[in-house]
Amino acid sequence: MGIVERIKEIEAEMARTQKNKATEYHLGQLKAKIAKLRTQLLEPPKGSSGGGDGFEVTKYGHGRVALIGFPSVGKSTLLTMLTGTHSEAASYEFTTLTCIPGVIHYNDTKIQLLDLPGIIEGASEGKGRGRQVIAVAKSSDLVLMVLDASKSEGHRQILTKELEAVGLRLNKRPPQIYFKKKKTGGISFNTTTPLTRIDEKLCYQILHEYKIHNAEVLFREDATVDDFIDVVEGNRKYIKCVYVYNKIDVVGIDDVDRLARQPNSIVISCNLKLNLDRLLARMWDEMGLVRVYSKPQSQQPDFDEPFVLSADRGGCTVEDFCNQVHRTLVKDMKYALVWGTSARHYPQHCGLFHHLEDEDVVQIVKKKVREEGGRGRFKSHSNAPARIADREKKAPLKQ
């Protein structure tokens, strides 16, 4: 029996099992088994060379956005309109057969937009080219799920289920659970909050399913069984997703209003070029990019080429800014002068851990360099004669 058949068999058993207090431990073990099998399903087959016709393209710019959706929902047309890159579009399905990259120039930044082939139901099980598409989505900073407004409800549920099956968690944050494997000592279980959806016995059974007998577990929130399994697996990707409802020109105004009010959603029409500017603004807000302008000493700030930081990738502190400028700037910095939204007054003297906001201006003041062998004194650039104390002392005269 293959992995896919075993997964379907366990899912059928879960569907037959009634959910109550007596069966919750059994259902928790079944969920752990399915998670293990899905992880095995994503692993490359043994003996393979690792090559093949992949979709991965080199990362470019300050962020990456992936277009995911069913075939013929307008992904290629949207890429062409936002980036100017030609992607073949037609009225029939599976027009796009490979990954087509484009670049969006927005707010002095460059954002890479990827047009991925349409995925079908069962993509997480290897149908079509779903695995390759989802692998590229995992490397993105934001997912735009493009949906047909006339049949969006069913498509949205199917796509979300396929992405969840391969470890993508859309619009969720990592659970506040500390988990660490140990070599000895057994399982240490602690919690800082009352648990209502999982207990210590169920955690032991899940860890036993993974053949883990020595570990530290600490719950900092009232998490679920699925949250704990995600932490044990350790390969989940938490990514933001915006649901883009295209082709709103073919549905009624009531349907458009209903779709626009759903969370994390935006309505557009590529045919009428409607609401594309708001889509770009929404992408910018979701990615959380922060532009920081550098100011050399005694010079005007450079507003042409900003340094782009991100809270999701690295951070937005003065230390992160220094690392982008040069890797040795952190140890050479004495303090930073900051102008902008994050500063209380202009300029504000800040340290390495000061959090920067969008369009801040930063000037780095370096430490003075000490002269070699000069007893800790600073280098002097003047032509003044050396002090008497600095001159080489002569040996005393012999009596």
From Swiss-Prot:
Residues 372-399 are annotated as: Disordered. InterPro entries: Beta-grasp_dom_sf, DRG, G_OBG, GTP-bd, GTP-binding_2, GTP1-OBG_CS, P-loop_NTPase, Small_GTP-bd. GO terms for molecular function: GDP binding; GTP binding; GTPase activity; mRNA binding. Keywords: Cytoplasm, GTP-binding, Nucleotide-binding. This is Developmentally-regulated G-protein 2. The keyword Repressor does not apply. Residues 388-399 have a biased composition (Basic and acidic residues). GO terms for cellular component: mitochondrion. The lineage of its organism: Eukaryota, Viridiplantae, Streptophyta, Embryophyta, Tracheophyta. Transmembrane segments: none annotated. Pfam families: MMR_HSR1 (PF01926), MMR_HSR1_Xtn (PF16897), TGS (PF02824). It comes from Arabidopsis thaliana (Mouse-ear cress). PROSITE patterns: G_OBG, GTP1_OBG, TGS.
